[in-house]
């Protein structure tokens, strides 16, 4: 049986993370800033009033420890596919439809081959989601 890999072994301290997330409560002060109404808090995120009868569900997806798996397999397109799949899954829970993908990549190294594989995965994931 393979060895279990934990968040702690990947360098993630879940207690500190939970403590840090408490600071997000400060954002509630901004929930009334829209002229169209208040931000609606859902169990997994928030939706934002975009016009009188429309809401925007904004998803920011991180790849987290998936990078470790991609490095071990030397296969990076799966990061893009998975990122899109997770973002779309978050969107459809509120009844939203995907609108766009931001092209913001946070990577330790700017390796053109890695970025190309990653973007191929993003395109494949978006195509599958369509």
Role assignments for model-derived ranges:
Residues 26-130:
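Glycine-rich phosphate/pyrophosphate-binding loop regions near the starts of catalytic domains
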Residues 2-36:
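N-terminal amphipathic/basic leader segments beginning at the initiator methionine
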């Amino acid at each position: 049986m393979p060895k279990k890999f934990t968040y702690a072994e990947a360098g993630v301290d879940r207690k500190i993370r939970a403590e840090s997330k408490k600071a997000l409560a400060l954002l509630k002060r901004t929930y009334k800033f829209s002229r169209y109404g208040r931000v609606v808090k859902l169990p997994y995120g928030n939706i934002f009033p975009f016009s009188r009868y429309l809401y925007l569900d904004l998803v920011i997806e991180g790849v987290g420890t998936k990078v470790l798996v991609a490095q071990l397999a030397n296969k990076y397109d799966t990061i893009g596919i998975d990122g899109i799949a997770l973002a779309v899954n978050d969107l459809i829970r509120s009844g939203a439809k995907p609108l766009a993908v931001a092209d913001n990549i946070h990577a330790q190294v700017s390796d053109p081959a890695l970025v190309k594989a990653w973007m191929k995965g993003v395109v494949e994931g978006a195509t599958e989601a369509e």
